[in-house]
Amino acid sequence: MLKNIVKMVLCAFLAATCGMASAQQGQQNPMAQPLQLMANPMTGQSYVKSGVLPNGLSYYILHNAEPKGRANFYIAQKVGSTLENPQQLGLAHFLEHMAFNGTENYPGHKMLDYLQSKSLRFGADINAYTGFDETVYNIDNVPTADAALMDSVLLVLRDWSCAITLDGKEIDEERKVIQEEWRMRNDSRTRFFTAVLPFIYQEYQYQQMPIGSMDIVMNFPYKDLRDYYHKWYRPDQQGIIIVGDFDAEAMEKKVVDLFTPIKMPENAAPRVYPNVSDNKEPIYFEYEDAEAPMTSVSIAFKQDATPFEERNTIGYWMNDVTETLVTTMIDQRLQEFSQKPECEYSNAGVYFGDYYVSKTKYAFNIDVEPKDNDIAKATSQAMEIVARACQTGFTDSELQRAKDELMSRFEARNNERNTTSNSVKARQLIRHFIDNQVLAGPEIDLQLFQMISSQLTTQVLNPMVKGLLTDTNQVIVVFMPKKEGLTMPGRKPMIAAVENAINKKYEAYKDEVITEPLIAKLPTPGKVTATKNNAALGTTEFTLSNGAKVILKTTDFKSDEIRFRCVANGGIQTVNPKDKKAVDNLSMLNTAVESSKLGNFNNTMMSKFLSGKQVAVTYNFGLVNTGLRGFSVKKDAKTMMELIYSYFTQLNPDPEQYAIDLKKTVVDMERSQNDPMKSFSDSLVNAMYGNDPRMTANTVAKVQSADYAQMLNMAKNTMANAADYTFVFVGNIDQQTLQPLLEQYIATLPSKGKASKAAKIYPVSFYTGNTTVSFDKAMATPGTTYYSFTSGPVVVDAVSDIDIELAGAVLNNMFTEIIREKEGAAYSPGAAGRLDENNKRWELISVIQTNREQQDKAFKLANEELDKILAGDITPDQFNKVKTAAINQYDIQLRNNNFWLTTILQSLRGIDTYTGHKEALQNLTLQDLQKWLKGLNRKNTVTVIMTGVPEKK
């Protein structure tokens, strides 16, 4: 790591800031202070109420006002699969499942029944995960106005801490569920990790995935699970984290009162994190899989990890900052080279982090995604770029851009400190509890970086990065598709690629500095010619002197966010499906625009230009409209306007860049043919859209047939008349600040003064009748995927939007209850209802992943439940669960900028599912829903079934 940088910078900084006072007062030499300072804990988030109970349990409680009236609850355990003995492989994860299947105060499934009756959704709000060294349970979006519910959720956490029932019957029923989870998750990436972990670790604790051995999962005696639970689920390994809109002091008292009585076991087993062995010679491992979506190379240079007790210090914080600067600069060079025709990789990047899955070993990592067959050459190219940086260092201009970028991030986080979501703040607290990571807070992060930034110079960084690429502790791993024409690179060429790059002598890098403006000369600003307000949506609409319209909605949901869209009628629906060339051009149109220059700036120059700016704008040719979308923080609103202006006025060809991006696209498409889910999704899209050529899946032949010049002209034509467009901005907008920018950059866009004549519409064809597509697919882990899509015409309004959503939610809950919990026929069966405003249709979607032996039963159950829904066969309990959840979620959505952006855009097309929505939802009765559902039927259903069969050996 870069620890020496930290010491040098802190010494320099403290000498500069403290030296005068120390000399005057005759105190100790300030140069002796940094190491002591480095070891002091970071205590920036003093507003977090935290403590350790006498039994060893830790707690962290934080008042947070966003989202309003909601709270998130977590119990984090420093417990995971590394604590299993060889007879318990998979039981840490199994125990996580059992926490939802009976506790002392909530027998059986009563916990989920109760929480769902109170608006909380299993999966979305109620969930958990198990890792190698941690298990975390969460209950999110709890309405804080419901005091009884808040107390009940605390009781759930208490039961998860010490009172999980582990009933034998429930254990046996859950075995099948976990077996289906294993089947569903055992894709090529999981198989790769299953193969690589025993090779790169000598320690058995890190040699298996947390889901474990299915032989053990299906056969372990109850006692093994209970032994693991009682041994490791104990207060000294547990942390309670609660973040939300509540009285933190009162919450702290409740936590102390409820969790203090939990007993800490006597003679508890020590919690040991296994150390990871070093290696003198390079470890090399290569793995091929017929379903692998791409070739990837991972190169790790292992390092000693910072001890846990030293991680919550200024020194550790400083180390993280310097690592971020280094990776930012190297990534910029890797990205810049990827834009060259001779580059053999599609993507490459570096990062510092845990060595694979272990917290006790750290690593500097280089990831490479080769394009074609020459894996060693792609690896060599990326390694040479990294080695050159480590050998010759960075330039002042590179470092300044990296510091500008990091400063911009710190500023944005600080600006959002009062509007950051519960989940984001909770994740920081969880990482602090489990890993002792720095808990400074955004204000201190920003203040510290402002103070030390000037001390972080190339003279400091360059000597230190020389030690990153070591001769020992190298680990090289290759993961690639198994297919004809692609061969494994082999140990010798890959080790040589790394070693030769490290030993090669390089010339210093010369950075191309961007000094010219994006826009050479701006025209005289236009004017706002008319203003009107929309009280219902809370918006202000401007008409500009060139005929363009602008809609502004000011919100306080996020302190430093502006979301943007501009749209004009058009899109795919205006392309004649019989015009093959135009259809082929659709396949690469958006890519062609993003490959092109804005003014004189190609992609590499644009990346440098945007350093230190939190802003993005992209082009989109959609189904029913065309235009731009983007976002910025407040300070970068001008840059966002410059980008908008440039798309409209100076979109210039870059055929070399397009050729590179086309090649990447073709490589990705060829690789995706290995993925069974690609075959499934292609079949689904083709069936749903009746093989409309504009909507069917892209092919290599189609994208290669696309004409770059024609596509660029097509895009320019869509932006030739600003009077066709409405520009929508939502966020923390100061109208007085934004209006001059609108007049300069939007009112001066090219315009014909009035909207263009409407283009001819060629409606996208949609399936009619009942269609079933069924096929077999060779798979390494055979499984069956089922997708059923039922739809019909409907009036588009708030009532329809609510009713179809609730119907889908009931169906989803029944799938979980019957197909997963009762029958164990699938791990995660799902259903949803949605309103398709564009086609004025309701949709009910069912998705199941199961196995060949149980597929008929699972499909039968799914269809029976769908028939019940359409017949209005819904119980009051089922209805109340989904209605309360919908109310809870809608209240949260109302404080989301993207929700309002979508609502305003829909209103432009005469679509209104907002007016009266909340009142209609609150007043909806079961009888209302049943009456509405009886108007639906199954006359239009597409079903796609892909059945896995074993691969031929």
Q: Which stretches of residues belong to each language-model region?
A:
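Bacterial Sec-dependent N-terminal signal peptides
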Residues: 1-27
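Proteolytic maturation boundary segments
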Residues: 23-61, 247-316, 320-331, 335, ...
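M16 family metallopeptidases and their MPP-like homologs
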Residues: 62, 67-84, 90-92, 109-159, ...
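Active-site His/Glu-centered metal-binding helix of metallohydrolases
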Residues: 91-99, 326, 589
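Peptidyl-prolyl cis-trans isomerase
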Residues: 114, 163-166, 170-171, 455-460, ...
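Non-catalytic, conformational "gating/processing" segments within enzyme and secreted inhibitor domains
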Residues: 163, 168, 175, 189, ...
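Flexible helix-coil linker/hinge segments at domain or subdomain boundaries
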Residues: 167, 264-268, 391-399, 654, ...
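Hydrophobic, small-residue-rich alpha-helical packing segments that form membrane-like cores
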Residues: 170-237, 241-256, 263-273, 277-293
